[in-house]
A protein has these predicted regions:
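Sec-dependent signal peptide recognition
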Residues: 1-7
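N-terminal signal peptide c-region/cleavage motif recognized by signal peptidases
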Residues: 11-16
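Short glycine/proline- and aromatic-enriched beta-strand/turn motifs that initiate or cap beta-hairpins
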Residues: 17-67, 75
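Repeated loop/turn-to-beta-strand initiation elements of outer-membrane beta-barrel proteins
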Residues: 25, 57-61, 87-89, 119-128
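Residues on the lipid-exposed face of transmembrane beta-strands in outer-membrane beta-barrel proteins
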Residues: 29, 49-53, 63, 77-83, ...
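Transmembrane beta-barrel strands of outer-membrane/channel proteins
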Residues: 29-33, 63-65, 93-97, 128-132
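Solvent-exposed loop/turn segments connecting transmembrane beta-strands
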Residues: 36-44, 66-75, 85, 99-110, ...
Length: 151
């Protein structure tokens, strides 16, 4: 976990400022994935720990670790770009890198860009991402990620 936190901080240094705002920091406990192939015995509950820091109204940085649908540990790091807001939801993409999927790239790191919608309240938020299937290497799903701001 130390390496993950160090990597997240390193990636944010380009945007680092002396006036860090804790109200822009979100913490999440992983994902819930509703898989398109529900008959494959995949893990829907994907517990973990992640962080998201809202840089401005359109950009945020994210990193975390979770137990994926193949029941293996995955790490991710990336950035959200959400230039549109419709009915209170920020719309855009999240791009970055993932690892830990045994059938995808031998469990190694791979890039991904996913469409995402986010709702952010005062204390709680929700990210909804569409994960497209990748042949027999990565199973498609709609993934939900609850997030909370710490006081």
């Amino acid at each position: 976990m130390r390496h993950l936190l160090a990597l997240a901080l390193l990636c944010c240094t380009g945007w680092a400022r002396a006036d860090f705002d804790a109200n822009r920091l979100w913490v999440n406990a992983g994902f819930y994935s509703a898989h398109f192939d529900s008959d494959k015995g995949l893990r829907n509950a994907n517990p973990g720990l992640g962080f998201e820091y809202r840089l401005d109204d359109r950009w945020s940085a994210t990193a975390g670790r979770f137990i994926n649908s193949d029941n293996a540990h995955s790490t991710y790091i990336g950035a959200y770009f959400q230039p549109w807001t419709v009915a209170g939801f920020k719309l855009g993409v999240v791009g970055g890198a993932f690892n830990g999927y045994p059938k995808a790239f031998n469990g190694g790191w791979f890039p991904a860009v996913l469409p995402v919608a986010s709702w952010e309240g005062q204390r709680f938020g929700l990210n909804v991402a569409l994960v497209p299937p990748l042949k027999d290497r990565l199973y498609g799903a709609v993934s939900l990620q609850l997030k909370v701001r710490l006081p």
